[in-house]
Regions:
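Active-site-adjacent loops and short helices of periplasmic peptidoglycan-processing enzymes
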Residues: 22-169, 173-182
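Domain-terminus/edge residues, biased toward the C-terminal soluble/receptor-binding domains
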Residues: 148-152, 160-165, 169-384
């Protein structure tokens, strides 16, 4: 049985009718060659400018380096490693590794993401994979897994040649994956810290300048220009912003993030535990069985977007039913496109009747007679 209802009017009681009405916000003009603003929870793209064009990405590459390393290490950064000569002396920004010194993987990891050490990138690659080329292969495989279809890596630090690139949309996908990894998310959100006598300061000024900023990564080369991936959270909503080749990246990120939070607020379509349907219940003293959403479903909605929900439940159900067991599904659509779904579970348990209803009728008739039944006669009448 499928029932299509107006999600906002019937289920969420947010506003009457079928259409969400909020104050309109106008998308800002940005100077970036490419830009993307993405909702972190759902992956919805809220703003895009030349989002699929492959471009040089400079040190934002290190988000993939960090993700692959964190996944390989299982988040354990406690191990101590001896710095090898071939890991040192890398051009550009540096952690200034010294051959023969011993450092923790945590120092290398945070040295990669905060001061953007190119030598730290090489060190992590070699510790994890044995050599840089193998690690870069892992990076490209992970990009493929994430659906980064306009991306190719040739090194772990972003110093690469014309064969090292990504699109703004792909970098937003990468940023979303990084936020879902606790080890990476914690590191990119760190403003500064001291590890093993090294003072590490994050290059991402938005951590100080933008309320709710949760970090990510800066980058710059002459070929790439200024590149930036940022994230921010407000009122339970996380946004990811990417700009490539943007001379005004700090201002553009602030404007895009403000726009996203204003124009696409996170809207709860169904709360976990909210009743979304009822069906006839057979074989029980109860007449109906209620089904509720197992998880909360939310989506960033813009002014004027129409929301509906399709509830799939059986036409009827036979007792017993058990609270929490799957009863059906609910699918949420925005302008006809599915944007979320959740299982429906039974809201409460209902046992099967232990007495036959016909037996109850027979017992009632007997009780109307001249002689009251014995206890044994009553039990016999009530047997199903």
């Amino acid at each position: 049985m499928r029932k299509q209802l107006a999600a906002l009017g019937v289920l969420c009681a947010l506003l009457p009718g079928l259409v969400l009405h909020t104050q309109a916000a106008e998308a800002p003009a940005v100077s970036a060659a490419s830009a993307v603003l993405m909702d972190g929870e759902t992956g919805r793209v809220l703003y895009a400018k030349d989002e699929n064009t492959p471009r040089a990405i400079a040190s934002t590459t290190k988000l993939m380096t960090a993700l692959v390393a964190a996944e390989y290490l299982g988040g354990d950064l406690s191990r101590q490693v001896e710095i090898q000569r071939e890991w040192t002396g890398i051009e550009g920004t540096s952690l200034y590794l010294v051959p023969g010194e011993t450092l923790s993987l945590k120092t290398l990891f945070y040295g990669l993401l905060l001061p953007s050490g190119n030598d730290a990138a090489v060190a992590l690659a070699c510790v994890c994979a044995g050599d840089v080329d193998t690690f870069v292969g892992w990076m490209n495989q992970r990009a493929q897994d994430l659906g980064m279809t306009h991306t190719h890596f040739s090194d772990p630090n972003g110093l690469g040649d014309e064969n090292h690139y990504a699109s703004a949309l792909d970098m937003a996908k990468l940023g979303r994956a990084c936020l879902q990894n606790p080890t990476v998310a914690e590191a990119v959100a760190t403003k500064s810290l001291t590890l093993e006598d090294r003072q590490l300061v994050n290059h991402n000024k938005l951590l100080w300048q933008y309320e709710g900023c949760t970090g990510m990564k800066t980058g710059y080369t002459r070929q790439a220009g200024r590149t930036l991936v940022s994230s921010a959270e407000r009122a339970g909503q996380t946004l990811i912003c990417v700009t490539l080749n943007d001379r005004n990246d700090w201002a553009d990120h602030k404007a895009l993030l403000d726009y996203g939070f204003s124009a696409y607020p996170r809207t709860v379509l169904a709360q976990a535990g909210e009743e979304l349907g009822r069906v006839p219940l057979e074989g029980s003293l109860l007449h109906m069985a209620a089904a509720e959403a197992r998880e909360t479903v939310a989506y960033p909605l813009q002014e004027g977007e129409r929301v509906t929900v399709q509830v799939d439940l059986p036409d009827a159900v036979q007792a017993p039913v058990v609270q929490g067991e799957i009863a059906g599904t609910a699918r949420f659509l925005v302008n006809g496109q599915v944007v979320g779904e959740t299982y429906l579970v039974w809201s409460s348990s209902a046992n099967r009747d232990v007495v036959d209803r016909k037996g109850l009728g027979d017992l009632w008739d007997f009780l109307q007679g001249e002689e009251a039944p014995t206890f044994a006669q009553a039990l016999e009448l009530l047997e199903p």
